[in-house]
Curated annotation (Swiss-Prot):
Binds 1 thiamine pyrophosphate per subunit. It holds the Pfam family TPP_enzyme_M_2. Catalyzes the thiamine diphosphate-dependent decarboxylation of 2-oxoglutarate and the subsequent addition of the resulting succinic semialdehyde-thiamine pyrophosphate anion to isochorismate to yield 2-succinyl-5-enolpyruvyl-6-hydroxy-3-cyclohexene-1-carboxylate (SEPHCHC). This is 2-succinyl-5-enolpyruvyl-6-hydroxy-3-cyclohexene-1-carboxylate synthase. Keywords: Magnesium, Manganese, Menaquinone biosynthesis, Metal-binding, Thiamine pyrophosphate, Transferase. Belongs to the TPP enzyme family. MenD subfamily. Coiled coil: none annotated. Gene3D superfamilies: 3.40.50.970, TPP-binding domain. GO terms for molecular function: 2-succinyl-5-enolpyruvyl-6-hydroxy-3-cyclohexene-1-carboxylic-acid synthase activity; magnesium ion binding; manganese ion binding; thiamine pyrophosphate binding. The keyword ATP-binding does not apply.
Amino acid sequence: MNHQETMTDYLMAFIEGLKNSGVEQAVISPGSRSTPLALLLHRETAIQTFVDVDERSAAFFALGLSKASQKPVVLLCTSGTAAANYYPAICEANISHVPLVVLTTDRPHELRQVGAPQAMDQLQMYQNHVKLFVEMALPEATEEMLNYAYWQGAKGAAFAQQTPAAPVHLNFPLREPLLPDLERKTKSSQQTALFAGQSILSTEQVQQLADQWYQKNGVLVVGGSHTEEEATLFIQLAEALQWPLLADPLANIVTHGQNSEVVIAHSDLFLNVATLPQEPEVVVRFGSLPISKNIMLWLKRLATTETAFYFVDENGQWQEQLKKSQTVIQAKETTFVEQLLTVVKPTEATWLAQWLLLEKTVSEVLLETLNATELNETTASLAVHQTMKENGQLFVSNSMAIRYLDRFMDSRPYRMFGNRGINGIDGIVSTALGMSAIAPTQQNVLLIGDLALYHDMNGLFLAKRYQLPLTIVLLNNNGGGIFSFLSQRTLREDDFEPLFGTPLDLDFSLVAELYGASYQEVKTIAELKQILQAAAEEPQFQVIEVKGNRQENVHLYESILAEIGRRVERQGISWNG
């Protein structure tokens, strides 16, 4: 058997292992050293392949594919700095528990550390940002080595999915010639069935917790990203306990559509500034903290009181930012909630009533204020939210876009995505396009600011290449709007603008033209809604620009808080805003 046949059989066995453990998509960054894997993946009918010449964009695109499909996705690149460009997306995937299978190809050992071109140290290059690293053996065609190749493929993809899900990295040293034998058929008939368990509490432990919470005034706080089925369980638990439910927007609880009164959608606008008549005796947290800073500050204050904190840690990593929980519960979240639903009992109705009163007051202020406000970043964000269909997918950028929705949106059924692992603005466009590639016939919308769009403009090429009908709503305040809400806003203008305001002064109509997207700048809320509603019925690749003013956003937010404060105080509740 010659080199070409040996390499082909070895790599085909590896790909069989990937398929066996659930891989259905691969994103390929073109290059020479990766030629055999790229060709064999491309020819594999069971794996859908995408090609992106920009490695950073490719990695975030794979991230979006995996987020939306909830399956492992392969990333493949050549040797050298190509692999380094995957780094930001791998870091995000690690923190947000997304299963990427990263395949880097490499020079063989005799060409390392001798000055060979396009060669660098790729061993353990992603360090502790991946949960598994494998330096693959050079291809051999013995039965033992074919089994080895299959096993590493099956193991890698399975490992990436196991709780806590995270990226894995396999590095392939390959010798020339690099062209595989495309006429050969797979020789691996091996199959591996995976039965994965989960962390679960005993019936006695669940009953013990239910007893501790009986007739206690409690709050459920849910962070992280969740499916509709998971969100349903959290809502059912809050209803069974008659406790308020505070959730991150990406938890898809507010966007669940069940419209349950226990879901407190606007807590960010009154927590930590309104003094509740009764404080919670129990706080039960699931996953990471929500995006709301006011929820975080309120919880930090409660942690100094007699309030008992419980932290449900599905991943077993003790990622408890407050470090104040007296009880850590290591269990699969959904299973734990299902167990609780069989034993918990509701608390007194007066506890939830104070939350409902505050929620009603805030909702009335928002309805009156925002309906009377012309088009700006806040009302544009709400227009996007209000025009989402039940099966629609909305990707929300970091910085201000997700905060507008967190503060102001009401209950409406659709699925929301975002990159809230490390919260960067890099790769947002590419991740959103990965999301849309999973369901291209559905409504797919990206809500994004001008800095984030500029940062990932290369990602737009994927929409052009694969005809992905993503509607991009661009909130353009010509710079970094979030800093107008932070302490940096007190700086002199000649310090603030170049370092934090960072105006771009870009004509985004030219960006849309470059990548083949239709473009419109809208001036009214009605015009924006009309375009969004049309796009929901007939999706297309387009950029809708809303030009805003950074200071106007701040003034609107402050005026809303002031009006909420006035009404809350008239109800006899102390307001510290």
